[in-house]
Amino acid sequence: XWSCTKGCPDAKQCEAT
């Protein structure tokens, strides 16, 4: 998954961790 701190392309697919 994507990491929110890395700046994912879609916040909805971004992991809360």
From Swiss-Prot:
<keyword id="KW-0106">Calcium</keyword>
<keyword id="KW-0348">Hemagglutinin</keyword>
<dbReference type="GO" id="GO:0045087">
    <property type="term" value="P:innate immune response"/>
</dbReference>
<dbReference type="GO" id="GO:0005537">
    <property type="term" value="F:D-mannose binding"/>
</dbReference>
<comment type="function">
    <text>Calcium-dependent lectin involved in innate immune defense. Binds mannose residues on the surface of the Gram-negative bacterium A.salmonicida. Shows agglutinating activity towards horse erythrocytes.</text>
</comment>
<dbReference type="GO" id="GO:0034120">
    <property type="term" value="P:positive regulation of erythrocyte aggregation"/>
</dbReference>
<protein>
    <recommendedName>
        <fullName>C-type lectin 35 kDa subunit</fullName>
    </recommendedName>
</protein>
<keyword id="KW-0964">Secreted</keyword>
<comment type="subunit">
    <text>Forms an oligomeric complex with the C-type lectin 65 kDa subunit.</text>
</comment>
<keyword id="KW-0391">Immunity</keyword>
<keyword id="KW-0465">Mannose-binding</keyword>
<dbReference type="GO" id="GO:0005576">
    <property type="term" value="C:extracellular region"/>
</dbReference>
<keyword id="KW-0430">Lectin</keyword>
<keyword id="KW-0399">Innate immunity</keyword>
